[in-house]
Amino acid sequence: MSIRIGILGYGNLGRGVECAIKHNPDLELVAVFTRRAPETVKILTETAAVYSVNDAEKMKDKIDVLIICGGSATDLPKQTPEYAKMFNVIDSFDTHARIPEHFDAVDAAAKESGHIGIISVGWDPGMFSLNRLYANAILTNGKDYTFWGKGVSQGHSDAVRRIDRKSVV
């Protein structure tokens, strides 16, 4: 029996998640949910369908895990707690300073509905944080550095998407 996966958001991250699912035979992509017109979204998985985000609740008994692939600035703070009420969820929330409040919101929604919410899974925090942990375990007297802070390395993609192209030209 495979784990049935849904993807919410089909930008670069959503497409990457779909490709990763294809490499894992114990995972099955069931649905992709989008805010765009579903018929305009072309996915690689022939056995999965594309739906409007408005139809996600109808699929709550057909999906084991919903991977939420939105932006940390505005999407994930709203979407992850909302969908944790219906699904087990995973997101890649990466605004370090707001992780505690995001955790609290997702945790409360997931506990209330009997679901599991896993947040901040990605590069940093995530794989980059694990690499730092491994290095600290080996180099016990070493000093590690991190390069995030106010206005640094937080939401670059989200900020770039909000640039008005007309004002740049």
Predicted regions and their residues:
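Rossmann-fold NAD(P)-binding glycine/threonine-rich loop
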Residues: F93-G117
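Short alpha-helices
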Residues: H115-N136
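General beta-strand structural signal in soluble alpha/beta enzymes
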Residues: V89-S92, G117-V121, F147
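Rossmann-fold NAD(P) dinucleotide-binding segment
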Residues: A56-D61, V65, A73-S92
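NAD(P)-binding Rossmann-fold cofactor-contacting core
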Residues: H23-T45
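Short acidic-hydrophobic, aromatic-tinged amphipathic segments that line or gate anion-handling sites
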Residues: A49-D55
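Active-site-lining helix/loop region of Rossmann-like oxidoreductase modules
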Residues: S2-L8, N12, G16, Y134-V169
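Short, hydrophobic beta-strand segments that form beta-sheet elements in well-ordered domains
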Residues: V30-R35, V50, L66-C69
